[in-house]
Amino acid sequence: MNSRLSNSVIKAEAQRLGFFACGMARAQKVDSTEERNLEQWLEQKGHADMQYMAKHKEVRLDPRLLLNGAKTIVSVALNYCPKVTIPQDEPQMAYYAYGLDYHDIVKQKLYALACNLGLHTDPKAARPEDQPFRVVVDTAPILERYWARQAGLGWQGKNRQLI
């Protein structure tokens, strides 16, 4: 297992796998502004009926609690725009709703990234909790947009989306 990889090697392999952006950030507690933003959002019930968003606040604020020993967060972006679109005269739907579930596609590519970087040799050989990494795609209590910003993938607009 390779425990020390350069950012350029990771980015090059991510690009080879089809990710159009990749960046890294040091795994650490979020800054005080982000912590206040999360607390206000929860107090104002910004999560509506998504009760799971109010759980595991400590983990959301410090990703090292999600994976013991975590040192780096690798954030990626993948364009899931379909190759074939619905004709304009037919009812439309969001691109992410086309075809295969993006969670599955991104997760598969992230496991391939780990394998190709020598972090993971056989996805079926060991339990995920035994790995030196953790793959998450909207499925863990982590502030994805914050970490994508920290990794240099964009900035957050007024709509709270990463641009």
What is each of the regions a protein language model found here?
Residues 1-163:
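Auxiliary alpha/beta "docking" domains used to position bulky ligands
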